[in-house]
C-alpha cells in the first residue's frame, strides 16, 4: 500500500510539474539570453553545431575502453565463483575483441588528428 501511494504521489507530482512547464513557458527574451556568451556562439541559432568526425571516432573508442574497465572491474570478486575457467575465458575474449578493434583503428589511422 505504501509503495502504491508513493508511486501515485510521484506520478502526480511529475505530471503536475510537466504540465506547468508546458503551459507556462517563458515568452519574453531577455537581452542577456539573446547575447552570445563565452565562445561567441549565438544562443538563438541552431543547436546542431558541426563537429569533427575524427573527434567522434576517438570519443567512441574511449567509451568502448571505458566500458571494458567497467566490465572487467568485478573480476576479483568473480574469482570466488566455481566456474573460474568460464569467467576467465569470457574476460579474455572481451579483451581480445577490444584489442583487435584497437589494432584495426590504429591501422586505419582512425586515432590520428592530422589529415
Curated annotation (Swiss-Prot):
Keywords: Electron transport, Membrane, Mitochondrion, Mitochondrion inner membrane, NAD, Respiratory chain, Translocase, Transmembrane, Transmembrane helix, Transport, Ubiquinone. It catalyses: a ubiquinone + NADH + 5 H(+)(in) = a ubiquinol + NAD(+) + 4 H(+)(out). One of its GO terms (molecular function) is NADH dehydrogenase (ubiquinone) activity. One of its GO terms (cellular component) is mitochondrial inner membrane. Pfam families: Oxidored_q4. It is found in: Mitochondrion inner membrane. The keyword Mitochondrion applies. InterPro entries: NADH_UbQ/plastoQ_OxRdtase_su3, NDAH_ubi_oxred_su3_sf. It is a multi-pass membrane protein. Its EC number is 7.1.1.2. One of its GO terms (biological process) is mitochondrial electron transport, NADH to ubiquinone. The chain crosses the membrane at residues 4-24, 55-75, 87-107. Belongs to the complex I subunit 3 family. PANTHER family: NADH-UBIQUINONE OXIDOREDUCTASE CHAIN 3. Core subunit of respiratory chain NADH dehydrogenase (Complex I) which is composed of 45 different subunits. Interacts with TMEM186. Interacts with TMEM242. Core subunit of the mitochondrial membrane respiratory chain NADH dehydrogenase (Complex I) which catalyzes electron transfer from NADH through the respiratory chain, using ubiquinone as an electron acceptor. Essential for the catalytic activity of complex I. This is NADH-ubiquinone oxidoreductase chain 3. It comes from Neotoma floridana. The gene is MT-ND3.
